[in-house]
């Protein structure tokens, strides 16, 4: 079973921020991702999507104007 959890690194030890279902001594693989970097990339993608949405909405308005002018 795999899951993603948040942890804090303190005094050389990764400490989960919530209870995990592991047996004592169980070996796991850990992927380190800095939250700030992930969050920064996420917000950059959101800004990119907002710009795309604005372009689509602008095109939609123009098409409505053309339709209204014709009919």
Curated annotation (Swiss-Prot):
Keyword hit for Signal: no
Statement: the UniProt record of this protein carries the keyword Ribosomal protein: no
Disulfide pairings: none
Keyword terms of this UniProt record: Toxin-antitoxin system
Gene3D superfamilies the UniProt entry points to: AF2212/PG0164-like
SUPFAM superfamilies: AF2212/PG0164-like
InterPro entries, per the entry: AF2212-like, AF2212-like_dom_sf
Function: Possibly the antitoxin component of a type II toxin-antitoxin (TA) system. Its cognate toxin is VapC17 (Potential).
Homology family: Belongs to the UPF0165 family.
Protein name: Putative antitoxin VapB13
Origin species: Archaeoglobus fulgidus (strain ATCC 49558 / DSM 4304 / JCM 9628 / NBRC 100126 / VC-16)
């Amino acid at each position: 079973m795999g899951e993603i959890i948040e942890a804090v690194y303190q005094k050389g030890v990764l400490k989960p921020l919530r209870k995990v279902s592991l047996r004592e001594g169980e070996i796991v693989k850990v992927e380190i991702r800095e939250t700030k970097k992930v969050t920064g990339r996420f917000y950059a993608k959101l800004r990119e999507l907002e710009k795309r949405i604005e372009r689509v909405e602008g095109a939609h308005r123009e098409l409505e104007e053309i339709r209204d002018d014709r009919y």
